[in-house]
Swiss-Prot record:
Organism for this UniProt entry: Hydrogenobaculum sp. (strain Y04AAS1)
InterPro entries in the record: 4pyrrol_Mease, 4pyrrol_Methylase_sf, 4pyrrole_Mease_sub1, 4pyrrole_Mease_sub2, rRNA_ssu_MeTfrase_I, SAM_MeTrfase_RsmI_CS
Source organism phylogeny: Bacteria, Pseudomonadati, Aquificota, Aquificia, Aquificales
Role, per record: Catalyzes the 2'-O-methylation of the ribose of cytidine 1402 (C1402) in 16S rRNA.
Record protein name field: Ribosomal RNA small subunit methyltransferase I
EC number(s) from the headed UniProt entry: 2.1.1.198
GO cellular component entries: cytoplasm
Name of encoding gene: rsmI
Keywords from the named record: Cytoplasm, Methyltransferase, rRNA processing, S-adenosyl-L-methionine, Transferase
GO molecular function: rRNA (cytosine-2'-O-)-methyltransferase activity
Length: 230
């Protein structure tokens, strides 16, 4: 049998493919980071009778052996993330890698991905981009100096609302003219983009008493945002 890699909505529960729903209905086992999150989706689509396997860092090694054993026993297993496409900034890649090494078929479904949604909605260059995952908590200055030394169209990273202002202020000292797009609460009721020069975006955030929601940060040194149309 095989491992199915199934993307799930990043906010709006309607953002799931018919094929993904059919896979979740057909398998007996679903590997997930947080069983509570996937249960909300399963309940929404009336999918019942599934065995949920907690698959999260740092317990993934134990579960990998269990999941591979299930597949060897002719069971299909679906891998899901808390939101979006599995293996993007989550431990899913380790399971996929292990299955490939064991010659177990891996079938990846296309679907929601916060970084791509944010990049497209940012209006910043898409011809080349670098995904940085979650913003680092240590050695930030040296990290960003190294990152911005590369010749890349856009840079994308995930950041928390509590740290976004500090991160932008640090980056502004390294690249004072960089263009920024903050994508907040993507696909949800309060979805918002804040776009502009990094200094202007910082000033906008300072006006707000409380920044909430999941954030994707897109940056570009090409300064193409809102230039006059040809």
């Amino acid at each position: 049998m095989k491992l199915y890699v199934v993307p799930t909505p990043i906010g709006n529960l309607e953002d799931i493919t018919i094929r993904a729903i059919n896979i979740l209905k057909s398998v007996k086992f679903i590997a997930c980071e947080d069983t509570r999150r996937i249960q909300i989706l399963l309940k929404h689509y009336n999918i019942e009778g599934k065995t949920l396997l907690s698959y999260y860092h740092p317990k993934e090694a134990i579960q990998i052996r269990k999941i591979i054993s299930l597949i060897r026993k002719d069971e299909d297993v679906a891998l899901v993330s808390d939101a979006g496409t599995p293996s993007i900034s989550d431990p899913g890649f380790k399971l996929i890698n292990a299955c490939i090494k064991e010659d177990i078929p891996v079938e990846v479904l296309p679907g929601p991905c916060a970084l791509i949604t944010a990049l497209v909605g940012s209006g910043l260059p898409t011809h080349s981009f670098m995904f940085l995952g979650f913003a680092p908590r240590k050695s930030q200055e040296s990290f960003y100096k190294e990152v911005f030394s590369s010749d890349t169209g856009s840079y994308i990273l995930y950041e928390s609302p509590q740290r976004i202002l500090d991160t932008l202020e640090l980056i502004s000292h390294i690249e004072p003219n960089i263009t920024v797009a903050i994508a907040r609460e993507l696909t949800k009721m309060h979805e918002e983009y804040i776009r502009g020069n990094i200094k202007d975006v910082i000033e906008e955030l300072k006006k707000r008493n409380n920044i909430k929601g999941e954030i994707v940060l897109v940056l570009s040194k090409e300064n193409t945002l809102y230039q006059e149309s040809l």
